[in-house]
Amino acid sequence: MKRILFSLLMVLLAVPTFAQVDKDHDFKAAKNMEIFNAIYKNLDLMYVDTLDAEVVVGNGINAMLRSLDPYTTYYPEQKMKELKNLLTGKYAGVGAVIRYNFQLQRVCISEPYENMPAAEVGLKKGDIILSIDDEDMTNKEVSYVSDHLRGEPGSSFMLKVKRPSTGKTMKVKVTRRTIQLPFLPYYGMLEGSIGYINFNSFTEQSAKEVRRAFIDLRKQGAKSLVFDLRNNGGGSVTEAVSIINMFLPKGKTVLEMKGKLQRSNHVYKTMVEPIDSVMPMVVLVNENSASASEIMSGSLQDYDRAVILGTRTYGKGLVQTTMDLPYNGQVKLTTAKYFIPSGRCVQALNYKHDKGGYVEHVPDSLTKVFYTAGGREVRDGGGVKPDVEVKPDSLPNIAFYLAGARDSNEVMLNYEVDYIAKHPAIAPAKEFSLTDADYDEFKTRVLKANFQYDRETEKYLKDLEKLAKFEGYYDDAKAEFEALKKKLSHNVTKDLDYNKDYIKHLLENDIVSAYYFQRGAIQNSMRYDKQIKEAVKLLNSPSEYEKILHPVKK
């Protein structure tokens, strides 16, 4: 234990020989490390209870790193698998999404992945996990169950589940294997000659899959492309550059990294000839498109190669590097900022590290103007702003509570599980839809369950009422407040009818995924996707497309 503590303290005390620091900084570092060392020695010697060095010092390390930014993280030896999963998108397990069932207060199967162990042994949406290798999973959290489902590739365990639709329990032997999270869950043709690629993670080998998908789409007759980066949180920079290279000529600068040290600086260029540098493209982005997604969308925007459509991206312009530590740990730390071809950095938050460090959002008024290759104006900070802003439909409050696992009766999950049990097969994914009678049955279930949820109008009315009382105006407007309360009181039937289409689409999407997995859910949802519809509309109008990328200069 003392050896572990000594090693951890030496890591903290170490000052890189290559760092060019002034004497004041050097003194402050040595002084505070000495204080830290002295504090822990006194704690270890005098504290009333015996301390766990790994826990106490580990908490200190984590607190220090949290004060810098959300991406700088310490991974001790026992968490190295977590880091590997993050970097590769791979883990050893059963290949299924699990969730907590609030009605039964147990963890259940939410979505088995296609061609993975969970699906192959017959596990279905809603199956309740009772035990793993005879260890009872009652009252266990999702993270606990997840840890027990994972293990070494090739290892087997006995899984006991209960199927809610029949009430029967079943015991199956499951063999874990390496699971590659689907980074390209679906690609195919939209209307006419428009190809579509749904891409959700820049992990190892993902560029090869995108290349294969794009070539296949061209063989199918694709003359234009919708490339969907919505909810893609990023990943490998090299994979991003390889994908960008499919659409940009050889020799183009895509990315420049700039850090404190010379070795952190790097320029990425397209290295080979592209597959297609002229095909019209629309790239879809949203607020969850981050990092490598912003490198790709921003680079294509800066070279006027594609129209970016959707909502402003996340704004992560920082680069992380992993470094080895003693005792087989690693630290993932921010070592550079990246700049896309126009010279801008998309970082939205400024992490201040001076006295009393704080986080500051870069306001639009302080952003700088940059220019694309064709002279269009773009700005730094705050992510990549789309050329065409199209906001998705807002999630109705009742749908949020039904689908957001806040319903203690689990009305939506139970309806879906029962529907799946009654229907061995359904229509093809892109054609499937629930009938009005199906929705009426769901509506009846919701009403019988005495479903409760908060309405935003009621919440704001209560806040307004409190404010009126505080300022002394409530008595004068009491009658109006009472009338509004009656008008805005809960009417679940009305809300279910008013939001029928949206809720129906949520149900259809969940049900389809049980038969056709993630690819089917994507196909089904595309029928109602406002942003995809706008992308198709734009690609079907070459003059509008050209007007955006090459506007007439005044």
Name every feature range the model reports, one short phrase each.
Residues 18-32, 36-53, 76, 85, ...:
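Cleft-lining beta-strand/loop regions that shape enzyme active-site pockets
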Residues 1-26:
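Bacterial Sec-dependent N-terminal signal peptides
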Residues 44-82:
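N-terminal, post-signal-peptide region of Sec/Tat-exported proteins
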Residues 71-111:
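PDZ/PDZ-like peptide-tail recognition elements
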Residues 345-554:
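Conserved functional hotspot residues or short segments at active or partner-binding sites
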Residues 292, 304, 311, 315-376, ...:
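Polar, glycine-rich mid-to-C-terminal structural blocks
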